[in-house]
Amino acid sequence: MNGPSSRSSHLSQPVVKSVLVYRNGDPFFAGRRVVIHEKKVSSFDVFLKEVTGGVQAPFGAVRNIYTPRTGHRIRKLDQIESGGNYVAGGPEAFKKLNYLDIGEIKKRPMEAVNTEVKPVIHSRINVSARFRKSLHEPCTIFLIANGDLISPASRLLIPKKALNQWDHVLQMVTEKITLRSGAVHRLYTLEGKLVESGAELENGQFYVAVGRDKFKRLPYSELLFDKSAMRRPYGQKASSLPPMVGSRKSKGSGNYRQSKSTIGSSDNSSPQPLKRKGKKDSNSEKPTKVKQSVKSKTSHQAIPDNGEGIFKAGAERSETRGAAEVQEDEDTQVEVPVDQRPAEIVDEEEDGEKTSKDANQKEDFSAMNGETEDRGGSKAAGTSEQEEGIPDHGEKKSSPSRVNGGTDEENGEELDQVAEELQPTEDEKGKAEGDNSGQDEAGLDAQRPPRPEVTVTSPQENEENEANKASSAVA
């Protein structure tokens, strides 16, 4: 009974197929494995739906299935074989490609290894050594502008390949050096020899760049410099002058040292430790003597004994040839320093003291009248008309300003004098007004305001008036 039942179970198992599907016309898609289950994939349309989700083609849903080699179209699910390769396509036609080789890594065939070992044969072929071969290094040249002796030479690196193209070399030189005439057309050596090709250029040499103008023969060799002299150690000054040969100190070096030692001994009264006598003293004195002798020799050689001095030019300059020396004359003016000029005597003026006294009196008078001018400013505006009629009255009014400037006692005495002086003037004023009343009334306008009256009061009267006002206000 167990036998037939087991056979029926084997026959009832579902059929499962596995296929590899490629994209139509895609040479880079390596294929996608799709499993066809009998229960899940019951029809061909369901299979197309499964392939659409697995392949994810850019053309959209899969509508046709083709064989990879011949492009035969499959229309039923029964035609698909397990383990086969197929191409999924849309509504477009089949595109023939080598789909089966997509994604496979091609292995290179192994080369046949020669197992036989040949013996070494010593040959007599002459081959140049490798270290003797010239390397392809760039050519370095130094360029100088035509007729320019001021600016230093410019360094230019020319590649080895560019030396064959002479126009390209001239273009590089033009970019490096700017000439007034424009581009660089020719290169010359310092001696004036024309360079016509890049093969004539030598590494590390100096050349003159010339434009449209002619080559100027100048001492370009003065621009050549020693690189070792240009380099200086770290911390040294850039513009360091050479030591002076034959200075004044070198002549009297011995006397200078002796005087310095005597001055130091006189200034410093403290006792100094005694030096030990022996070999050290003799050794220390020898090099100093040698240095002094060397300095004296150099100083005698440097300074000539002509009596003309070191500031006298040895040879005549080309610029001063033919120039005549101008002799001094009576009309020539010579500037003399201030210390050497004769002293000039200035006579004092007789009126100097008088003018100084008048100035001092005016200053004192203006200081005393400073306060009165502010107070009497308003009153002066009203009394200007009266001062026009009587000129002498204005001079006499200056006395009250002095009265206000002093103390109370002085003001009291001066006020009495002022009152006595003003009485005859008031009488004269009344007479003049009586005589000229008819003429003044006829000449004046009816709308003219009356003249203000000026009264002079002492400080004591002012205090009494203020006290009376205060008492009346209290009452």
UniProtKB/Swiss-Prot annotation:
CDD domains: DCX2_DCDC2. Residues 353-365 have a biased composition (Basic and acidic residues). Pfam families: DCX. Residues 234-475 are annotated as: Disordered. Expressed in hair cells of the inner ear. Residues 252-272 have a biased composition (Polar residues). The modification Phosphoserine is found at S270. Residues 407-425 have a biased composition (Acidic residues). It comes from the Eukaryota. Keywords: Cell projection, Cilium biogenesis/degradation, Cytoplasm, Cytoskeleton, Neurogenesis, Phosphoprotein, Repeat. Coiled coil: none annotated. It is found in: Cell projection, Cilium; Cytoplasm, Cytoskeleton, Cilium axoneme; Cell projection, Kinocilium; Cytoplasm, Cytoskeleton. Gene3D superfamilies: Doublecortin domain. The keyword Zinc does not apply. Residues 17-100, 139-221 form the Doublecortin domain. GO terms for biological process: cilium assembly; dendrite morphogenesis; intracellular signal transduction; neuron migration; neuronal action potential; regulation of cilium assembly; regulation of Wnt signaling pathway; sensory perception of sound. InterPro entries: DCDC2_DCX_dom2, Doublecortin_dom, Doublecortin_dom_sf. The keyword Zinc does not apply. One of its GO terms (cellular component) is cilium. Protein that plays a role in the inhibition of canonical Wnt signaling pathway. May be involved in neuronal migration during development of the cerebral neocortex. Involved in the control of ciliogenesis and ciliary length. This is Doublecortin domain-containing protein 2. It comes from Mus musculus (Mouse).
